[in-house]
Amino acid sequence: MAGLSTPHQFDHPTALAAAVLTDDNRVIVMVIGVVALAALVVAGILVRQVLAAGEGTDSMKKIAAAVQEGANAYLGRQMRTLGVFAVVVFFLLMLLPADDWNQRAGRSVFFLIGALFSATTGYTGMWLAVRSNVRVAAAAREATPAEGEPEKDLTAVSHKAMKIAFRTGGVVGMFTVGLGLLGASCVVLVYAADAPKVLEGFGLGAALIAMFMRVGGGIFTKAADVGADLVGKVEQGIPEDDPRNAATIADNVGDNVGDCAGMAADLFESYAVTLVAALILGKAAFGDSGLAFPLIVPAIGVLTAMIGIFAVAPRRADRSGMSAINRGFFVSAVFSLALVAVAVYVYLPGKYADLDGVTDVAIRAKDGDPRILAMVAVAIGIVLAALIQQLTGYFTETTRRPVRDIGKSSLTGAATVVLAGISVGLESAVYTALLIGLGVYGAFLLGGTSIMLALFAVALAGTGLLTTVGVIVAMDTFGPVSDNAQGIAEMSGDVTGAGAQVLTDLDAVGNTTKAITKGIAIATAVLAASALFGSYRDAITTAANDVGEKVSGAGAPMNLMMDISQPNNLVGLIAGAAVVFLFSGLAINAVSRSAGAVVYEVRRQFREHPGIMDYTEQPEYGRVVDICTKDALRELATPGLLAVLAPIAIGFTLGVGALGAYLAGAIGTGTLMAVFLANSGGAWDNAKKLVEDGHHGGKGSEAHAATVIGDTVGDPFKDTAGPAINPLLKVMNLVALLIAPAVVKFSYGEDKNLGVRIAIAVLSILVIVGAVYISKRRGIAVGDEGNAERVTKSADPAVVS
């Protein structure tokens, strides 16, 4: 941070008014909009292919219908809750400074559009996933021949089931990239040079909804999962997804609202937020070209995602389903790199002096070729995605040493399993963070002495990574679909023998894809947040110039300087690091509280209905679904308020310099924490799978019980707290970007008003403290049986029949 005030300066002019959307660029953006619509058309084709498959037996259909009903009930209630919140934010955005009312109105309207698109992406993922899972199970059932029938071709059956699952993910991937690109291109077409400011609202809408879907879905899924495992596997000794466990339907619902809806919304907002930063910085660094080129790169990604999704066609020579998925990913990445190279050399000029609309004298006078900067920056993002995929796979796959070591540690008990998993998570966080950091720094160096070009290169690296998002979302959705398919098969009892083995193999591949995509999602979040950090710096520079102040150099006010040696900035840095820990703790505590209620409800049903164990009585699945729904929605408020109000409190209390340090602290700590939580949880999960496959005693052994405990600890790590850090970073950066002009306005110049600053800061702090206090007052102990029973009695048993 201190280095940002030395050779890289903002003292030269950065007026952006000269950049315009030329007629040629307008045509290009319109074509990009058509490409986005084409992605939605392809999604429609894939939906028809998936739904054309058979649904299996009546028992399988009944279980699938229960999962569908529970998922719809949860998301419906969540959307109603978030709808009220979105309307409030819509009007609050109108109060923030803007050049004119047209900009203010556009920012607020596109906030709602961003929120709607994010919710649509998540809902679409959930809607199709809960319909395709039974079709995957039905396809696998074909592997077991009926009496008198010849043996089936297991490879062909496995490939059919896998294709259904991956095409489901392809639909979600196409919606993610299609809606993200459509929203951004529409803003550019309507607002032209003002588009970056309006896109801030679009990005905030996408980010807020994604964070709530991530946190809420994560709490729901892991409360049900942990509760089901503790009572079912550990206490009752019954298998996973056993129909006698009242939490199994809620567990399957959670897979969809957490992994499908949550991840889709998460990557959609990464898409939107990265485009926001790239257009803001591109307008300053590349002038007229900067309003179109950041859209060209992800448009190429849409086309290559289509190729990658259809390239995932299993072959007989493949060692596993993962081979086909890796092939699709790398085909998409290679095609993206090649097409971006063509686009760069066709679209961009060969000299910085030929970039129209750039008023920064230093950029116009710079030697070198802007095409090289653009090409290398995008390549860094694409290569980073591939490296993160391999690194995450190393620490989480069952065939690699880290997971095998955790599996071996199960021979000495649960404590050593937990310790080994923590060790793997901590170590993997270092390597992943260094890899992401090198990627960001490598892109930054491309700018030379120009801070604006350096920051734009970081944003372009983010757009390069986004070229793989379509396939990444497909890979992630594949996981819960295959997991749910296995659950439906086990609960129905209609898929046995070879068919059950097909689903077991698919589930193992799905666990790996989920772990890998979490790593890449973290990388996209960090690059997006880093690019937004650059946009934030540009915003405070512009705001400071408007009130006649300088950001750096002699005479610059202390709390405008991005200098870590200043006490207020150091406090901001520490606060940014601390908020990540608080956010993670709140998320894990929420799972613990909800899981406690689930545990006591499932225990109550086993105690009061002994016929459940011999199948003479039916568990009340709906009660557990409703407990998870109510708890997840109740727990949303505190993390959400923390993410939005903490930057406001820091900014209005300590100034924009400290707020910049706060963002830097959050990005650094958030990167390490997110990777640690995701990889340790993924490693514990696959260590359990390793033992269940027959190693170290297999199912029912003491080693298996130890790995179940490790997996239970890892569940809220990898599926609640870890993934929720991604949108947290982007929400805080966007809030800082939006409030920066207001902080400067009330701190300097004619509108300086200390009273307003203090009032806003105190109000924000009081709300945060109050929300955390209320959250902490709720019982955290799993043994709080009275609290669990109160929750149980208030549950509505009619959610799922």
Curated annotation (Swiss-Prot):
Stated name of the protein: K(+)-insensitive pyrophosphate-energized proton pump
Binding residues for Mg(2+) 1: 225, 229
Keywords associated with the record: Calcium, Cell membrane, Hydrogen ion transport, Ion transport, Magnesium, Membrane, Metal-binding, Translocase, Transmembrane, Transmembrane helix, Transport
GO CC annotations on file: plasma membrane
Binding positions (substrate): 222, 718
Transmembrane segments: 27-47, 81-101, 109-129, 170-190, 201-221, 261-281, 292-312, 328-348, 372-392, 406-426, 429-449, 453-473, 515-535, 571-591, 641-661, 663-683, 724-744, 754-774
Family per record: Belongs to the H(+)-translocating pyrophosphatase (TC 3.A.10) family. K(+)-insensitive subfamily.
Subcellular compartments: Cell membrane
